[in-house]
């Protein structure tokens, strides 16, 4: 029940506007690396020193105007340049709605190609985040178009979607770099598993499908059972460490992240920054309502 409440709040534009004005003081600092690219760079440098890789995400989604989309696109380019300038072990992640997908597919494609051009210049990999189901088809279509132009482009497949395995099979000709995730949006039972067990079993089957295809696989999970399954699978099939990695979110299980890195696995941390943090933060609380305690602490300190 609480999960649905927080997912509903994540889509509330009035609360998003208030949170943006208030800043990350409402407890979000645990999960968000500050407001600026400079703060994100500082965070990634610290992670890199601990043996962790990163992917930087400038927070924002559902751009309501071309001006907003343009601003996000420019910030993405700035982030890529910062990654190169500071020699960070980091990639870039972005959401298509943040660069104008809801305004027009042409606008989002124009911005994406410009971002990828800069990424290619600086040899920085980029991942297109998957959003809610209403944007699913467009995201896969845009990924297919741009993957042929930019080799170091990945996208995300959500394990709670029934169709996920078939979509992975359809992409095999692209040799896709995929981040496999559980899925964090509120979706209808008509398209997504409504329960954790069904999602977890499907998640495991997707990991096996993608890894055994020989394509690069990022297993994005904080679940020890999924981690153990992946470890056993790669050991049984002698899959090289260069073909996969684990990913976790900044601020969640940091000690476990370091443990995996020390065990010799590539461990990448998703590092978001920016003022448009509310929707992202609410989804993190929806995944684990106990995180709501950090919101209360943030308010009581003021």
From Swiss-Prot:
EC number: 1.5.5.2
Binding site for FAD: 130, 158, 182-184, 221-222
Gene Ontology MF terms in the entry: FAD binding; proline dehydrogenase activity
InterPro entries: FAD-linked_oxidoreductase-like, PRODH_bac_arc, Proline_DH_dom, Proline_oxidase
Active site positions, chain numbering: 129, 179
Keywords from the UniProt entry: FAD, Flavoprotein, Nucleotide-binding, Oxidoreductase, Proline metabolism
Pathways involved: Amino-acid degradation; L-proline degradation into L-glutamate; L-glutamate from L-proline: step 1/2
Residues the record marks as site: Critical for catalytic activity: 270
Induction remarks: Repressed by FadR in the absence of LCFAs (fatty acids of 14-20 carbon atoms). When LCFAs are present in the medium, they are converted to long-chain acyl-CoAs, which antagonize fadR as to its binding to fadR boxes on target DNA and thus derepress transcription.
Residues annotated for substrate binding in this entry: 95, 283-284
EC class name: oxidoreductase
Catalysed reactions, semicolon-separated: L-proline + a quinone = (S)-1-pyrroline-5-carboxylate + a quinol + H(+)
Coiled coil residues, start to end: none
Cofactors, names only: FAD
One GO term (biological process): proline catabolic process to glutamate
The keyword Flavoprotein appears for this protein: yes
The organism's place on the tree of life at top rank: Bacteria
Free-text function comment from the UniProt entry: Converts proline to delta-1-pyrroline-5-carboxylate.
Similarity section: Belongs to the proline dehydrogenase family.
Name the record gives this protein: Proline dehydrogenase 1
């Amino acid at each position: 029940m609480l999960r649905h409440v927080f997912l509903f709040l994540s889509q509330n534009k009035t609360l998003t506007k208030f949170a943006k004005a208030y800043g990350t003081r409402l407890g979000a600092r645990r999960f968000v690396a500050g407001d600026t690219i400079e703060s994100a760079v500082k965070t990634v440098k610290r992670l890199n020193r601990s043996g962790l890789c990163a992917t930087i995400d400038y927070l924002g989604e559902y751009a309501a105007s071309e001006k907003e989309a343009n601003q996000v696109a420019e910030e993405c380019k700035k982030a890529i340049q910062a990654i190169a300038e500071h020699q960070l072990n980091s990639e870039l992640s972005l959401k298509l709605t943040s660069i104008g997908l809801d305004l027009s597919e042409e606008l989002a494609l124009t911005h994406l190609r410009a971002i990828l051009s800069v990424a290619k210049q600086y040899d920085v990999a980029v991942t297109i985040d998957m959003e809610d189901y209403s944007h699913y088809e467009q995201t896969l279509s845009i990924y297919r178009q741009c993957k042929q132009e930019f080799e170091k482009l990945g996208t995300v497949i959500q394990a709670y979607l029934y169709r996920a395995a078939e979509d992975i099979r359809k992409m095999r000709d692209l040799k896709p770099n995929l981040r496999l995730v559980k899925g964090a949006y509120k979706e209808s039972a008509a398209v997504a598993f409504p329960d954790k067990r069904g999602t977890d079993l499907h998640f495991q089957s997707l990991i096996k499908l993608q890894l055994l295809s020989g394509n690069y696989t990022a297993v994005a999970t904080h679940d020890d059972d999924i981690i153990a399954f992946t470890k056993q699978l790669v050991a049984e099939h002698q899959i090289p460490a260069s073909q996969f990695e684990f990913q976790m979110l900044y601020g969640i299980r940091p000690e476990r992240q370091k443990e995996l890195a020390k065990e010799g696995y590539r461990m990448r941390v998703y590092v978001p920054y920016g003022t448009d943090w509310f929707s992202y933060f609410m989804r993190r609380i929806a995944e684990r309502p106990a995180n709501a305690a950090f919101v209360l602490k943030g308010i009581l300190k003021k």
